[in-house]
Amino acid sequence: NQNKSRRVFGKPETFSVHFPDKAGKGGKAMKRILTAAQMKQADRNTIETMGVPSLVLMERAALSCVEELQNGTWDTGKVLAVCGPGNNGGDGAAIARILKTKGVDAELFCLGNPEKYSEGMRAQKKIAENYGVREVKNPDFREYTVIIDAIFGIGVSRPLAGEYRRAVEAICASGVPVLAVDIPSGIHTDTG
């Protein structure tokens, strides 16, 4: 079970990455990668202009992650979604819930002050609990076959501190494969 990552280099305004051509012709297709500001604007436009609720965006993100987890390259024997206080955490709670409905042993480890959770995180956590997803405190990350990094997404631009830093360090030290929602927590969206 190898976790491969793509590295992208360039100025934030001009990030692009090469992917194999989907037509199978061996060529290269270019995909534009947005900056954090551009991605936030795209989310805002989708919600405010197009009328797509934030919870629908979370559900779509969660479904995409579940699809990746079930592509045959991940061992989903026991999954832990490590959730931050924002909508990225809500994505993680939704992933755990969807996995649970598919018979996967999925649990939540929620960081931050529950009184400061985003509306989306509160809603997705409650739904996950209603589906029987258990929240754990002080997990031994080595007990899991996959960890979902849903701590922070594109919105964070400062170094990790406190319980967030400790969680990321423990996840890294565990050696367990990690699937990050949006971007690995602690990585600056524009500069890497």
Stretch-by-stretch model annotation:
Residues 30-75:
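Positively charged, low-complexity intrinsically disordered leader regions
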Residues 14-29:
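Short, Lys/Arg-enriched N-terminal segments with co-localized hydrophobic residues
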Residues 30-34, 74-192:
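Glycine-rich phosphate/dinucleotide-binding loop and adjoining beta-alpha-beta core of small-molecule
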